[in-house]
Amino acid sequence: MSDIPSDLHYTAEHEWIRRSGDDTVRVGITDYAQSALGDVVFVQLPVIGTAVTAGETFGEVESTKSVSDLYAPISGKVSAVNSDLDGTPQLVNSDPYGAGWLLDIQVDSSDVAALESALTTLLDAEAYRGTLTE
């Protein structure tokens, strides 16, 4: 069974979301996703400052098996990207919930309520587990 930490939020697209500040979330792909992808060889992420829209693609993960799109779980602005993935994309495989994180998204600080609302629409660990067919 895949590792599914209970303190994170999830999407049906196999991404995890962790609140990392008052107006910021960190995003990565789940253990299930990295396992299904196989060995990750390249991660394409947007540049810092790029606006992302919930439900729309913001990048892709390329593995030895396939290329998969990445979808923004919330709308906001990219405030950080994991530059370690440029030289070591396999961090997505070895530590998907830690060193293999993808990016941080910051919402408008005057609209933190929108972040709270967006987080409530995401899956909790139990609901995400229910979407998996292993």
Curated annotation (Swiss-Prot):
Cofactor note: Binds 1 lipoyl cofactor covalently.
Cited function: The glycine cleavage system catalyzes the degradation of glycine. The H protein shuttles the methylamine group of glycine from the P protein to the T protein.
HAMAP family: GcvH
Domain Lipoyl-binding: 24-106
Keywords carried by this UniProt record: Lipoyl
Quaternary data: The glycine cleavage system is composed of four proteins: P, T, L and H.
NCBIfam families attached to this UniProt entry: gcvH, PRK01202.1
Protein family per UniProt: Belongs to the GcvH family.
GO BP term, pick one: glycine decarboxylation via glycine cleavage system
Protein name: Glycine cleavage system H protein
Species lineage: Bacteria, Bacillati, Actinomycetota, Actinomycetes, Mycobacteriales
Cofactor: (R)-lipoate
Cellular-component GO terms for this entry: cytosol; glycine cleavage complex
N6-lipoyllysine PTM positions: K65
InterPro entries assigned to the protein according to its UniProt record, in alphabetical order: 2-oxoA_DH_lipoyl-BS, Biotin_lipoyl, GCV_H, GCV_H/Fam206, GCV_H_sub, Single_hybrid_motif
